[in-house]
Amino acid sequence: MDPALSAVRLTVQEAIHILSSSEDAGHILSTLGTLKRYLGGTEDPVLPEEKEEFATVHFSAVLRCLVSKLSPGWLELSPGGQLERLWESFFLDGPPDQAFLVLMEAIESTAGPSFRLMKMAQLLDTFLSTGRVAALMEEQCRPQTKPSFPLFQETLLSKVVGLPDLLGNCLQRDNLTQFFPQNYFPLLGQEVVQALKAVVNFLQDGLDCSVSFVSRVLGKVCIQGRKREILSVLVPQLTVLTQDSCLWQRVCWRLVEQVPDRAVEAVLTGLVEAAPRPEVLSRLLGNLVVKNKKARFVVTRKLLLLQYQHTTPMVQSLLGYLALDSQRRPLLIQVLKELLETWGCSSAVRHTPLEQQCYISKAILVCLAHLGEPELQDIRDELLASMMAGVKCRLDSSLPPVRRLGMIVAEVISSRIHPEGPLLKFQYEDDEMSRELLALATPEPAGDCSSVSRGPSPAPVDTESPVEMPEKAVESDVPPTQPQGSDSELDSDDEFIPYDMSGDRELKSSKEPLYIRDCVEALTTSEDMERWEASLKGLEGLVYRSPTATREVSVELAKVLLHLEEKTCVAEFEQLRQSALVAVTVTDPEQVAKYLTSQFYGLNYSLRQRMDILDVLVLAAQALSRPKSLQRRSQHGPPVPGTMCSPALAVSQTGNVAAPDWQVVVEERIRSKTRRFSKGCPQRELSGVPNEFSSVAGYFFFPLLQHFDRPLVTFDLLGDDQLVLGRLTHTLASLMYLAVNTTVAVPMGKALLEFVWALRFHVDIYVRRGLLSAVSSVLLSVPTERLLGDLPDELLEARSWLADVAEKDVDEDCRELAVRALLLLERLKDKLLSSSSPQP
């Protein structure tokens, strides 16, 4: 055995014995000073071999001995805090990995609040704030040859990353703020940067090193859900350091390459979220997606196809990263193909939420913006096939946003694969989502860090607007200036007062018909367009003024209006036709409702006419369920769907007559003498009137349920006509709600729940929304006692289905409607229990 090594062992053993037994301050300080020589930084250093043996073999034992002696009395043996400072220096100046593990071991083994526990926690706080964690990671980056080194590193890794949880469990309410996760992980990110700077210095000096431990620290932190805290500090500094240094770029590439496979997704997601631009992401990741299969799967599939919660700038940064290098651009083309394949899948359209479809559409548009003309021409046929399939299944959707997505993406794709041909144009609402999607189709200018030319910029999609050139519009509004003294100035009429023509009315040769039969004749046989238009515009008011005459020809008039086509350009033709049809239905509800419901399942009707029937039934039912003073507004049009009964509108014609002067004086005097502590909005009570819809609700409701499962030659509710089925479910829900507290509400509710149960697993989102609304309507309209007495089995079945929808449905609106229905069920149960409980 080497005598020098044996001497170190003997010295350490003797020192531990003295520290354990002696109470003499001078003796203790002398012993600690002797041991401090092995850590360096003294005037009398030891041999390098002795220093290495002490650090690798004996240092942990010395630290444990120092921890065991920690007490207020032991530290006060030396006045002035000299012993305490010397005691702390062993933890702060020695090998950081062993000091850190001994500190963590001591804190975890100390039970309950105590002086030793808080002193060790404060020392650990000092250890962190003085940069010792960076020194710890720097030490792990050096080459290691010990057999036990992997196990030691694993222990060290778990303690470094799990420090906030471990300290929180040990200190509980006495925990220090530095150990909170929101404070610790940004500090750890700063320490990672310092460790990487040391690695760069090693490489510049020609020394060998590894960033594997730092990669594992980063991966474990991201797996535990703290990637935002650590990367918010790490990424901005690496962005600056890698801007002008290829060595720093290589270190960053190596850092992410050595992240364990189980942590690749978390690290990549965090980096993509934190990187401000594609060039920054390219400097941090390099060609990782080309070398690493797991990284390629995460970037090209998981972040784009399986997840959809990421922001639009993140998608742009991710796809821009793929477009910046020639080795990665084939992956961009592959991503576009896979996105379009998913976008064109009818099953995906039915079973994925709208948010995910919008996310995929944005990714497609960003891909198209990054690809050049030659690259797109190579895959032109595949793009065209996917586009046609996607447009077809989206235009068949019942949801307007889904249809709009199909139109916009199809316009952009067609403009890119056929730039020389006629542009494909659709008519859709110009809302915020449409503008955002069209903006994504135009690529941003390539940055200076782009390593590959992106080819010719794609032509922006032609978004036709009413005003093409603002300058031309200005020119058309402002007359051209004329030189002074011109003839136009002499002939000007500006000094004359303009004639008021605001009250002028258009003179018509045909007068408005005065009788219902004249209107029917004019609408069916008249060739005079002015008379036809006048009949249509005056029909609604005439129906309300002549109810008896209307009932004589109500069915005939409803038939004429249902089949009426626009012969000439009439403003608001559809609204006028619908208002007149609603007025006829309100005037003679039983006969007209029988006719309309029988025609809903009839042959040779368009989908538009069938949906018109449903709209008219709902509007008429809404009008019948209101007081007459609200529904008979012959001069102001029919009731608008969704309009609530307002007390101000319920005042009758007689109630609106001006009061006499003496009554006004008396009321004013009373009002001035009255002291009021609070005053609400003035309201007039509505006079009680019967609900006219209650007697005819069955004629509106039950015929619509009879043949929904019987396909016709041109009409199949359970097949392709899902839009009409969705409108039918919403119509039935509205009729059920308007039949509240009526005698027919119970059989209506039972029939509606059976209808819902038959269609509860329908794939169309719009249909499921209507079914869920129908359940809520039943719960609101049928009395509680009748619900639980007549429909207990149906409610139990509906409850289990609602719970399943609230948890698993892909559509957010469906989940929300299911939760509301469940809350209504709970409220009904609580109401029943409170009413059945004995009163004290």
UniProtKB/Swiss-Prot annotation:
Biased composition (Acidic residues): 488-497
Residues where N-acetylmethionine is found: M1
GO MF entries: Hsp90 protein binding; kinase binding; molecular adaptor activity; protein kinase binding; protein-containing complex binding; protein-containing complex stabilizing activity
Pfam families (alphabetical): TELO2_ARM (PF25320), Telomere_reg-2 (PF10193)
Modified residues (Hydroxyproline): P374, P419, P422
Residues of the site described as Interaction with PIH1D1: D491, S492, D493
Effect of M407E: Does not inhibit interaction with TTI1 or TTI2. Inhibits weakly interaction with TTI1 or TTI2. Inhibits interaction with TTI1 or TTI2
InterPro entries in alphabetical order: TEL2_C_sf, TEL2_Regulation, Telomere_length_regulation_dom
Record region (Disordered): 443-497
Annotated Gene Ontology cellular component terms: chromosome, telomeric region; cytoplasm; cytosol; membrane; nuclear body; TTT Hsp90 cochaperone complex
Location, primary (coarse class): cytoplasm
Highest taxon above the source species: Eukaryota
Compartments it resides in: Cytoplasm; Membrane; Nucleus; Chromosome, Telomere
One GO process term, biological-process aspect: protein stabilization
Coiled coil: none
Residue positions where Phosphoserine is found in the record: S457, S486, S488, S492, S837
The entry's keywords: Acetylation, Chromosome, Cytoplasm, Hydroxylation, Membrane, Nucleus, Phosphoprotein, Telomere, Ubl conjugation
Post-translational modification: Hydroxylation by PHD3 is required for a proper interaction with ATR, and activation of the ATR/CHK1/p53 pathway following DNA damage.
Purpose: Regulator of the DNA damage response (DDR). Part of the TTT complex that is required to stabilize protein levels of the phosphatidylinositol 3-kinase-related protein kinase (PIKK) family proteins. The TTT complex is involved in the cellular resistance to DNA damage stresses, like ionizing radiation (IR), ultraviolet (UV) and mitomycin C (MMC). Together with the TTT complex and HSP90 may participate in the proper folding of newly synthesized PIKKs.
Subunit record text: Component of the TTT complex composed of TELO2, TTI1 and TTI2. Interacts with ATM, ATR, MTOR, PRKDC, RUVBL2, TTI1, TTI2, SMG1 and TRRAP. Component of the mTORC1 and mTORC2 complexes. Interacts (phosphorylated form) with PIH1D1. Interaction with PIH1D1 mediates interaction of TELO2 with the R2TP complex composed of RUVBL1, RUVBL2, PIH1D1, and RPAP3.
Similarity remark: Belongs to the TEL2 family.
PANTHER family: TELOMERE LENGTH REGULATION PROTEIN TEL2 FAMILY MEMBER (PTHR15830), TELOMERE LENGTH REGULATION PROTEIN TEL2 HOMOLOG (PTHR15830:SF10)
Protein name (Swiss-Prot/TrEMBL): Telomere length regulation protein TEL2 homolog
